[in-house]
């Protein structure tokens, strides 16, 4: 049996980490399967959005599988972390939109996985946290870099240096999650995004992500280049035509 359970609905896939007994922890096999599927949807224009969640209602992803980690040599740990970082970065760079549905506990690498997604919906009973300092290490899957970019340096230091966990209400207040709701809400959000022109959605996603690393002048030039990518598309013409005809546009990603 695979580590991911994948279901498709229209142009959206739902990926469920299928390891409820181990609180959907990040194993080597799971990370490898995530990497394979990120590569697949990044090439498949039919899939425009992915909702990523965990099996059951107790955990989204409780972080690294510490039982597996205990059997690994230092070199194997380093190799695992390299694969983890590469996979999260590939997910982040994909043209596909990723929405994490944080259905339960998301600690350590589980929160880092959610941070790699474009958007996050959190269940009312879920908790998130980068708890690594309590184990004598630091976040190794991008948490020290993605968290401050999302919620600000001070708030990120608070969470990372204390290792404390936050419930849904605080996660929303901090901006760690954008919405609170159910899996159905996350899927509906994904479907809503998929109604828009896919080339435009991808260009906007990359303009935002890449622009954060530039000064304002450089970021505005980046926006101009990304905008230019949409000018010659059939989708842009379809959007104008549909507006004039007062109907819903049918975008084909061309």
Tell where the protein language model's regions lie, with residue ranges.
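C-terminal long alpha-helix characteristic of the crotonase
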Residues: 20, 121-126, 168, 176-234, ...
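Terminal low-complexity tails and localization/encapsulation signals of metabolic enzymes
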Residues: 1-4, 241-254
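Glycine- (often His-adjacent) and acidic-residue-rich active-site loop
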Residues: 54-89, 106, 215
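Terminal peptide-recognition signature
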Residues: 15, 19, 33-34, 52, ...
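Acidic, divalent-metal-coordinating active-site segment for phosphoryl/phosphodiester hydrolysis
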Residues: 164-170
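CoA-thioester-processing core
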Residues: 87, 91-95, 101, 107-161, ...
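Conserved CoA-thioester-binding segment of acyl-CoA-metabolizing enzymes
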Residues: 1-53, 75, 89
